[in-house]
């Protein structure tokens, strides 16, 4: 289960951000293709707006596009190295302001000042307690009628699967010591997976948060005075399992809340592959090589 400290250690080192994080868009054929193919079509209904809040921008992979859709962009990250790089990268853009936080605070953001909040490919590493803290603050920071688009883990929906990460695999069986209730055979299979992970034979979902799911986010929204309007469950690098979720939330109005619209999409990686192959086709048509 990634903690704030673990995430700071994992993502706070400059040598892990070669090419400003563009390596994580390779499946799409590049960052610009990922933005134009898989991100912008999903958020175009919500921008442009006066003020955008980006949570966990890293080295500004999406900030470079978002900044063209607002009069003011506030970027908040737990990593001082990431914030320093964003300040350097967007020094010529005075409407972009960058802040270091403690991994869960939005105290530097004025209440009722945000028209659109955004986070992509970062909060998947954040556990349920931190997501709940962010949502509680977004309930105050978002203007009435504003929206947030949040990319988070849905790994918690697979809590009964043997393919959960090694941290759960090391829990004691039958709920001992506060661990999850599970059969001894399931626990033993989890232990085997843990060993395979230690030996480098299994990739445990890229440090996805184990306690987060689409359902957990909806419950946290209710507690924060927010309404979850839509959720898209997607695969990410690991077959067809819907281990990630894109959620759209907004401050709850006076009327009764409706259940969010749900879409199960096991084809996000196919979307990425098509974008990459199409771009390669037309790039090769232009080149003689």
Enumerate the predicted regions with their spans.
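A conserved beta-strand element that flanks and buttresses the S-adenosyl-L-methionine
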Residues: 118
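Short catalytic micro-motifs in class I SAM-dependent methyltransferases
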Residues: 121-122
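A short glycine-rich, Lys/Arg-flanked "PGG" loop and its adjoining helix->strand segment in the class I
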Residues: 132-144
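Class I (Rossmann-like) S-adenosyl-L-methionine-dependent methyltransferase catalytic domain
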Residues: 1-49, 59-107, 126-130, 147-289
């Amino acid at each position: 289960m990634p903690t704030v400290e673990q995430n700071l250690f994992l993502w706070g080192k400059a040598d892990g951000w070669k090419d400003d994080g563009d390596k994580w868009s390779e499946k799409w054929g590049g960052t610009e293709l990922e933005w134009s193919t898989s991100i912008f079509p999903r958020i175009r209904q919500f921008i442009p707006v006066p003020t955008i809040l980006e949570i966990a921008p890293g080295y500004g992979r999406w900030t470079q596009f978002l900044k063209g859709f607002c009069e003011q962009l506030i970027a908040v990250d737990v990593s001082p190295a990431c914030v320093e790089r964003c300040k350097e990268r967007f020094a010529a853009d005075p409407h972009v302001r960058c802040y270091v936080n403690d991994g869960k605070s939005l105290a530097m953001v004025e209440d009722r000042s945000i028209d659109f909040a955004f986070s992509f490919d970062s909060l998947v590493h954040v556990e349920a307690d931190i997501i709940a803290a962010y949502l509680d603050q977004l309930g105050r920071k978002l203007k009435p009628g504003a929206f947030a688009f949040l990319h988070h883990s849905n790994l918690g929906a697979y809590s009964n699967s043997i393919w959960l990460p090694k941290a759960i695999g090391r829990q004691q069986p039958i709920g001992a010591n506060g661990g999850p209730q599970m059969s001894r055979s399931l626990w033993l299979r989890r232990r085997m997976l843990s060993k395979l992970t230690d030996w480098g034979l299994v990739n445990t979902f890229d440090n996805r948060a184990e306690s987060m799911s689409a359902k957990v986010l909806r419950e946290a929204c209710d507690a924060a005075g927010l309404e979850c309007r839509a959720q898209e469950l997607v695969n990410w690098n690991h077959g067809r399992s819907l281990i990630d979720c894109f959620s759209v939330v907004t401050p709850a109005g006076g009327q009764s809340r409706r259940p969010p619209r749900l879409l199960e999409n096991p084809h996000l990686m196919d979307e990425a592959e098509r974008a990459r192959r199409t771009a390669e086709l037309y790039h090769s048509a232009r080149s003689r090589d």
